[in-house]
Amino acid sequence: MESLTLQPIARVDGAINLPGSKSVSNRALLLAALACGKTALTNLLDSDDVRHMLNALSALGINYTLSADRTRCDITGNGGALRAPGALELFLGNAGTAMRPLAAALCLGQNEIVLTGEPRMKERPIGHLVDSLRQGGANIDYLEQENYPPLRLRGGFTGGDIEVDGSVSSQFLTALLMTAPLAPKDTIIRVKGELVSKPYIDITLNLMKTFGVEIANHHYQQFVVKGGQQYHSPGRYLVEGDASSASYFLAAGAIKGGTVKVTGIGRKSMQGDIRFADVLEKMGATITWGDDFIACTRGELHAIDMDMNHIPDAAMTIATTALFAKGTTTLRNIYNWRVKETDRLFAMATELRKVGAEVEEGHDYIRITPPAKLQHADIGTYNDHRMAMCFSLVALSDTPVTILDPKCTAKTFPDYFEQLARMSTPA
């Protein structure tokens, strides 16, 4: 297996313009495909997940052109539900941001479509979404294991009264919200259980509004969506930088700045993961906010004990930042780490122990006490982009770190290690 050894880094300094947000890119692509008119998307993320969405849209007859660097996409909308040219199978890799929204959107009208993906995708639960779509009339079959992809979709979704479980993934609610306006009937969506990753719902509502559709949101417990609507292209749309990707650079600034400035997100950003900067501030770093930048300057870091439900992806970065903080850090209410690209709670606990940390892994929390000195280890990445990027921070010590399968960062940030090296002064 390919590996990359990062030598100790003395200082991290400088600015980085972030690649586009994965969450925003794939939502914007789907809405542009469903909309009336042409949309020019700029700062689109070029990554595996986005390529899977683009390939699916192409197979569904959507016309688009990409710039040479794949960060601008001019897409001609379908002016309504997507139509398959006949029976179709779409392979979506391990892209949850493609699988969940497409599973809902392709239940409009009369298609026959199979959605499948990599082996890990077949372990990522989708039963709560399927249950909700069936309540709205959708015909869906599981082709292998009950509650998991691959799925066969045969249309039939008309709207109506729907319940959705919000406790596993906010993407199920996102998928229903984006699909419901195109259903023939009005839809009332009731959320049961605690809604995880609520800020991601704000991204969805924000984008729907940009494409001309507003819905009634009653305290994130009930959403009322008028049926028979259309999405309308905003013409041009700039995808903001990926706030989860920003977390690694901001953390590096907190640990070994200098000052690190990330551009493409800021106080006006719609992504909840910008709140990651507040956590670094609580730990002792200095944060400066602009409309389209966040800067982090080094401070003496101390441990925290926090509920991380609102920023589950960026919270992973705090787990490795904790290696540089004084005391024991506890991250709580993060059960949904277990249903991501890998079981991230298990993976994080396992790899933190390899570098010498004392770790307690609970059902929905992790407790981390750093060692006096970090140990050089080969870090397994579990085909999970965030594991690779999180553990790169270990090199901000006097110990090297070896990352196995470093190219797995292609899911959201193909040139991550090059960018980190550009801003680093070797020890």
Swiss-Prot record:
Record protein name field: 3-phosphoshikimate 1-carboxyvinyltransferase
Residue sites binding 3-phosphoshikimate per the record: K22, S23, R27, S169, S170, Q171, S197, D313, N336, K340
Source species taxonomy: Bacteria, Pseudomonadati, Pseudomonadota, Gammaproteobacteria, Enterobacterales
GO BP annotation list: amino acid biosynthetic process; aromatic amino acid family biosynthetic process; chorismate biosynthetic process
EC number(s) per entry: 2.5.1.19
UniProt-annotated catalytic positions: D313
Pathway: Metabolic intermediate biosynthesis; chorismate biosynthesis; chorismate from D-erythrose 4-phosphate and phosphoenolpyruvate: step 6/7
Subcellular location(s) of the protein: Cytoplasm
Binding site for phosphoenolpyruvate: K22, G96, R124, Q171, R344, R386, K411
Keyword annotations: Amino-acid biosynthesis, Aromatic amino acid biosynthesis, Cytoplasm, Transferase
UniProt subunit comment: Monomer.
A GO cellular-component term linked to this record: cytoplasm
Enzyme class: transferase
Function: Catalyzes the transfer of the enolpyruvyl moiety of phosphoenolpyruvate (PEP) to the 5-hydroxyl of shikimate-3-phosphate (S3P) to produce enolpyruvyl shikimate-3-phosphate and inorganic phosphate.
The organism of origin for this protein: Salmonella typhimurium (strain LT2 / SGSC1412 / ATCC 700720)
GO-annotated molecular function: 3-phosphoshikimate 1-carboxyvinyltransferase activity
Catalyzed reactions: 3-phosphoshikimate + phosphoenolpyruvate = 5-O-(1-carboxyvinyl)-3-phosphoshikimate + phosphate
SUPFAM superfamilies per record: EPT/RTPC-like
